[in-house]
Amino acid sequence: MEELTKRQSQVLDFIKSYMEKNGFAPSIRDIMKHFNFKSPRAAHKHLIILEKKGYIERKNVSRGIKMMPKSGEIFATETLAPVSGKIAAGDAIEAIQTISDYIPIPTNFFPKNYEYFSLRVEGNSMIEAQIKSGDFVLIRKQDYAMDGDIVVALIDGNDATLKRYKRLNEDEVLLIPENKSMKEIKVKADHLKIQGKMVGLIRVL
């Protein structure tokens, strides 16, 4: 691979750290804002160079950046995430935690100091977040959430659902679908348990 300039290395490092933290790639505007570029064109130019030099691959979709292995390197550093059943992207369904398989995930993107599991999505309530029925979502285990996170939420200890999280006040939480045809779910905070945050998506084509 061709050597990178200092700025190109900084952009690449930002993309890596952003993906590790959020589970998806930054947008051009995220890059522009972080580096105080005057226009999206400057950020786009850096992505073109990184792709030409073989460090990333881009798809013609929003946030469509994929990290490429360095020359001579393969993704040998992997960890296994158990497939722990299914999750509702629709009405909440009874939580199922039987491990049926394991999915390898590269530690290049997902730090080893966390635990992960995956769930098969059922339903279309998150379709506008590009999460389709049949997809597998990769979940980082944690018992807390920030506004805007997509989480696995357990309601009343039995029913699990995949929704976007929003804290209304000390007593109530809103679970928001990414589908305009579906209703939000308002839940008492003490009736809700966060099981993890979505950090990745796996789709079998």
UniProtKB/Swiss-Prot annotation:
Pfam families given in the database record: LexA_DNA_bind, Peptidase_S24
* Sample GO molecular function, one term: sequence-specific DNA binding
**Site residues, Cleavage:** 89-90
Q: Which GO terms describe its biological process?
A: DNA repair; DNA replication; negative regulation of DNA-templated transcription; proteolysis; SOS response
Query: Does the record bear Transcription in its keywords?
Result: yes
Q: Which domain of life is it from?
A: Bacteria
| InterPro entries, per the entry | LexA, LexA-like, LexA/Signal_pep-like_sf, LexA_DNA-bd_dom, LexA_repressor, Peptidase_S24_LexA, Peptidase_S24_S26A/B/C, WH-like_DNA-bd_sf
Q: What is its EC number?
A: 3.4.21.88
| Reaction(s) the record says it catalyses | Hydrolysis of Ala-|-Gly bond in repressor LexA
Q: Please give the subunit comment from the record.
A: Homodimer.
Instruction: Identify the PANTHER family for this entry.
Output: LEXA REPRESSOR, LEXA REPRESSOR-RELATED
Role: Represses a number of genes involved in the response to DNA damage (SOS response), including recA and lexA. In the presence of single-stranded DNA, RecA interacts with LexA causing an autocatalytic cleavage which disrupts the DNA-binding part of LexA, leading to derepression of the SOS regulon and eventually DNA repair.
Family the UniProt entry places it in:
Belongs to the peptidase S24 family.
Instruction: Tell me what this protein is called.
Output: LexA repressor
Report the source organism.
Petrotoga mobilis (strain DSM 10674 / SJ95)
